[in-house]
């Protein structure tokens, strides 16, 4: 398995995120629902396009925004877990996942649908203000409400810049 992936994706395997992902796949064994052939056929950033499009349609959220959040949050790793405990592709905190009815935060469909629903709610809460919605997604709505603007938390400020940059790039690409 590793030989096939190393041959097919030599540059990607140099990234710090690739090897832990491959190790988790190897350890998961038969629980992994993706085959090597399907992995090799679809780049990770496009593996979830159908789910992203579905979530975007259901929750009226720009699919490029969902993809940008997912890229920033998990680098398209469905098994990602942050130091704070956020889980899955859209890095849902456990309490948020429960509130949105997510039974398995590592299930791509459940995670993407809940993440898109959360984005929609935050956009509505902030009257369409993308910057405040993203700050709330990262730091929590309560903290953003306290500040009344992007909090002076470096991680949140960097997050908003990163996601809006990815979104701008996505809209600039034909």
Language model features with spans:
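Generic N-terminal initiation segments characterized by hydrophobic and/or small/turn-forming residues
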Residues: 2, 18-19
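Catalytic glycan-binding domains that act on GlcNAc-containing polysaccharides
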Residues: 19-174
């Amino acid at each position: 398995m590793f030989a096939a992936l190393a041959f097919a994706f030599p540059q990607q395997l140099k990234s710090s995120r690739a090897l832990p992902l491959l190790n988790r796949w190897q350890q998961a064994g038969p629980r992994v629902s993706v085959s090597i052939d399907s992995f090799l056929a679809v780049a990770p950033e496009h593996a979830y396009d159908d789910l992203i499009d579905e979530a975007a349609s259901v929750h009226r959220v720009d699919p490029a925004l969902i993809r940008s959040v997912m890229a920033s949050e998990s680098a398209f790793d469905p098994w990602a877990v942050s130091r704070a405990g956020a889980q899955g592709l859209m890095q849902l905190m456990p309490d948020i996942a429960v509130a949105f009815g997510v039974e398995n935060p590592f299930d791509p469909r459940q995670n993407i649908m809940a993440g898109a629903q959360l984005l929609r709610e935050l956009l509505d809460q902030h009257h369409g203000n993308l910057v405040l919605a993203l700050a709330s997604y990262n730091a929590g709505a309560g903290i953003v409400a306290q500040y009344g603007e992007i909090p002076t938390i470096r991680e949140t400020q960097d997050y908003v810049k990163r996601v809006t940059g990815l979104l701008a790039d996505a809209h600039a690409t034909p």
